[in-house]
A protein has these predicted regions:
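Sec-dependent signal peptide recognition
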Residues: 1-8
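C-terminal motif of bacterial Sec signal peptides marking the signal peptidase cleavage site
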Residues: 15-16
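Extracellular/lumen-exposed scaffold segments
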Residues: 46-47, 74-90, 105-107, 154, ...
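A mature extracytoplasmic/lumenal domain signature
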Residues: 67, 107-111, 129-131, 159-163, ...
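Acidic, glycine-rich flexible loop segments
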Residues: 126-164
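Extended, aromatic/histidine-rich regions of cofactor-dependent oxidoreductases associated
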Residues: 163-204
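Start-of-domain marker
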Residues: 19-75
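Mid-length scaffold segments of soluble, non-membrane domains
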Residues: 79-139
Length: 204
């Protein structure tokens, strides 16, 4: 398994003779590959990992945004692509510049995870951008973050770490649909691209 992961990273152009950012993203993607093999629900097998594709890591795709908590926001049902819903609550709003455009992204708490000590700090950032359906998955992408990332009125969002939901590889999953307020009016050439393998239709 480890040899395959190393091969995948080399194939993607990530190696130890690179910038600190590239090294960080290399380690991040190593863990990302491992999760596919350790998760019993995973839609991918070991041989599929070589078909994962990513944009090169870039400094400008890691942005510092102002952050405004949304205290006492009400829980709501976030729809998923399967037709079911999941309970979330808006935790705060990040505001940032991308080129000559201003943008906002909302971050959410998954209410089903709040009582889990392993995830009580977890924040969910789903978004869409203008690469969706072209070079990236049409249903949007996700970034995992933590409450500790939001300190002193700012938050760092690293689009190099955005990834596809399981629905990009197979049906049968309850993948949240990014809310309209998180539709970005520009292209984000960072993180995971379209899967190069075949989509698996397993039914529901």
């Amino acid at each position: 398994m480890i040899r395959l992961i190393v091969f995948c990273l080399l194939f993607l152009g990530l190696n130890s003779c690179s910038s600190p950012l590239t090294k960080e993203i290399t380690e991040y993607r190593k863990e990302y590959f491992k999760e596919f093999l350790s998760d019993p629900r995973s839609p991918l097998k070991e041989a599929d990992l070589a078909k994962l594709d990513f944009f090169p890591a870039g400094e400008k795709e890691r942005i510092t945004a102002s952050f405004q908590p949304t205290n006492d926001s009400e829980p709501f049902d976030m729809p998923t692509y399967s037709g079911l819903t999941r309970k979330y609550r808006k935790y705060g709003v990040a505001t940032f510049s991308w080129g000559n455009k201003q943008a906002t992204l909302s971050l959410y708490e998954n209410l089903s995870l709040l009582n889990n000590p392993d995830f009580d700090d977890y924040l969910f950032l789903p978004f869409k951008d203008e690469t969706n359906g072209v070079t990236t998955y049409g249903g949007g992408r996700y970034i995992n973050m933590s409450k500790a990332d939001a300190e002193d009125g700012t938050i760092t969002i690293d689009f190099n770490k955005c990834y596809n939901p399981y629905c990009a590889y197979s049906d049968g999953f309850n993948c949240p649909i990014p809310p309209r307020e998180n539709n970005l009016p520009f292209e984000v050439h960072a993180g995971e691209r379209n899967f190069k393998g075949a989509y698996t239709a397993v039914g529901h």
